[in-house]
Amino acid sequence: MAKFRASNILGDPFALATVSISILAWLIACIASIISDIKTDYPNYSWWAVAYMFCCIMGVTIVFGSDTGLVYGVAVVGYLSTGLVLTTLAVNSLVYADESSSQAAAAGFILMSMVIVVWIFYFGSSPQATHRGFIDSFALNKESSGAYGNRPMSTAYGPRPDTMSTSAPQMYTSAQLNGFETSSPVSGYPGGGPGSENRSSSQARFGNPSASNVAGNNSGQDEVPPPTEYPYKAKAIYSYDANPEDANEISFSKHEILEVSDVSGRWWQARKSNGETGIAPSNYLILL
């Protein structure tokens, strides 16, 4: 697991605010529950809600501090969903009590429930969600995710196939391929199949294609230009360093605006403001 850093919480306004409010709400509920238990018959069920929420708050604090929300997000949502049920039932058993201490405990549970709803909405959303990208944009250390280093999510997609090269394929015209046609549609050999009488004359059919190939390669009309339309715009929610072994990838910094031509795959064809083009992982970007 990644190392816990207090700066990940102090530098993230969302994490700092929600963790602080949850701790304050838990202290209110816990202290009020102790006082209520002394004065009246306090429901034992609510003590389990207090203990369970203590573990949940500590767990979420560790996730924020280690910046591993993308790794443990599903588990966090599951535990918080159970905590929301417990705090809601605790509120129902305390809010109608006559003692002010019981009502104060119910207020603490209500405040915790509100924070839980916000956390579930945050951790339950994908990194590409607009609201999550907006929240993460205020964090100072969010781009250097502790669980993944400088490239937090690139390993999630596995190896990228080599067929996604951005270079235009070499195209040939019928004039360039003159002499390469097969005269026998069955055998696929010029001049007929192996052993045919016309087999010996097949070399004459090829002629000297090297000259025509050179001329064809030099003519601009035979080349297919790379895509020039980039109808989408995306904002980088993390910094990304391109793999030095792959010339097709591009590097970009957090909050940088990129132009994107295709958003159907996991790797998007993008163009930077300086005109540099290449592919970028889609889970680092959010569409604008």
Swiss-Prot record:
<dbReference type="InterPro" id="IPR036028">
    <property type="entry name" value="SH3-like_dom_sf"/>
</dbReference>
<comment type="subunit">
    <text>Forms homooligomers.</text>
</comment>
<protein>
    <recommendedName>
        <fullName>High osmolarity signaling protein sho1</fullName>
    </recommendedName>
</protein>
<feature type="domain" description="SH3">
    <location>
        <begin position="229"/>
        <end position="288"/>
    </location>
</feature>
<comment type="similarity">
    <text>Belongs to the SHO1 family.</text>
</comment>
<feature type="topological domain" description="Cytoplasmic">
    <location>
        <begin position="66"/>
        <end position="70"/>
    </location>
</feature>
<dbReference type="GO" id="GO:0030833">
    <property type="term" value="P:regulation of actin filament polymerization"/>
</dbReference>
<feature type="transmembrane region" description="Helical">
    <location>
        <begin position="45"/>
        <end position="65"/>
    </location>
</feature>
<keyword id="KW-0812">Transmembrane</keyword>
<feature type="topological domain" description="Extracellular">
    <location>
        <begin position="92"/>
        <end position="103"/>
    </location>
</feature>
<feature type="glycosylation site" description="N-linked (GlcNAc...) asparagine">
    <location>
        <position position="44"/>
    </location>
</feature>
<keyword id="KW-0472">Membrane</keyword>
<feature type="compositionally biased region" description="Polar residues">
    <location>
        <begin position="197"/>
        <end position="221"/>
    </location>
</feature>
<feature type="transmembrane region" description="Helical">
    <location>
        <begin position="15"/>
        <end position="35"/>
    </location>
</feature>
<dbReference type="InterPro" id="IPR001452">
    <property type="entry name" value="SH3_domain"/>
</dbReference>
<keyword id="KW-0728">SH3 domain</keyword>
<feature type="transmembrane region" description="Helical">
    <location>
        <begin position="71"/>
        <end position="91"/>
    </location>
</feature>
<dbReference type="GO" id="GO:0005886">
    <property type="term" value="C:plasma membrane"/>
</dbReference>
<keyword id="KW-1003">Cell membrane</keyword>
<comment type="function">
    <text>Plasma membrane osmosensor that activates the high osmolarity glycerol (HOG) MAPK signaling pathway in response to high osmolarity. Regulates radial hyphal growth and germination. Involved in virulence and mediates resistance to oxidative stress.</text>
</comment>
<feature type="topological domain" description="Cytoplasmic">
    <location>
        <begin position="125"/>
        <end position="288"/>
    </location>
</feature>
<keyword id="KW-0325">Glycoprotein</keyword>
<dbReference type="InterPro" id="IPR035522">
    <property type="entry name" value="Sho1_SH3"/>
</dbReference>
<feature type="topological domain" description="Extracellular">
    <location>
        <begin position="36"/>
        <end position="44"/>
    </location>
</feature>
<keyword id="KW-1133">Transmembrane helix</keyword>
<feature type="region of interest" description="Disordered">
    <location>
        <begin position="183"/>
        <end position="230"/>
    </location>
</feature>
<feature type="topological domain" description="Cytoplasmic">
    <location>
        <begin position="1"/>
        <end position="14"/>
    </location>
</feature>
<feature type="transmembrane region" description="Helical">
    <location>
        <begin position="104"/>
        <end position="124"/>
    </location>
</feature>
<dbReference type="Pfam" id="PF00018">
    <property type="entry name" value="SH3_1"/>
</dbReference>
<keyword id="KW-0346">Stress response</keyword>
